[in-house]
Amino acid sequence: MIAIDTNVLLRYLLTDDKVQAARAAKLINGSKTVLVTDIALVETIWTLKGKKYGMSKAEIIQVILSLFAEPNIVFEDSQTVWQALYDYRQAKPVTVAGKRKEADFPDALLVNKAKYGAAINGEVIEAVYSFDRAAGMLPGVTEP
């Protein structure tokens, strides 16, 4: 198994640097299992949603689905990432200070990692507390 960082994953997804994209593809399409850590996934999504790339929610969903379709790519906990993707898709927008806002995929992953962390410790998460009103639309999130 190998792991890749955010930059390798971005070059693979965007193919915006031909040399680095080819090297990234060689790793990802090689003979080894490729771990995409939660941190690399979250940083990738933040970058893709940011000013430079400006990807929409629908595009982010497609990117994550495409990673699940890659035969060599695995996540730290695929079930948690999958549930986070589901919650992200289902989250309703809220209006904050007159602007429409939606929970981000990293918010959904944080909530689901909290649930997973509690479960592996024999607990059930009572709530994930956040001041982010959009994140508050995710199952299990409440304001303190």
Map each language-model feature to its residues.
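Histidine- and aromatic-rich ligand-binding microenvironments
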Residues: D5, V36, A103-D104, D132, ...
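Active-site neighborhoods of divalent-metal-dependent phosphate/nucleic-acid chemistry enzymes
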Residues: N72-Y129
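Short, polar loop motifs at secondary-structure junctions
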Residues: S130-G136
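Short glycine-/acidic-enriched loop or helix-start segments at secondary-structure transitions
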Residues: L138-G140
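Amphipathic alpha-helical segments within well-ordered protein domains
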Residues: I45, K49, L65-F68, L85
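Active-site catalytic pocket residues across diverse enzymes, especially alpha/beta-hydrolases
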Residues: K52, G117-N121, T142
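Short, well-structured N-terminal submotif of metal-dependent ribonuclease cores
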Residues: M1-V36, K52-Q62, V124
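Short, conserved active-site loops that position catalytic residues or coordinate cofactors/metal ions
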Residues: D38-W46
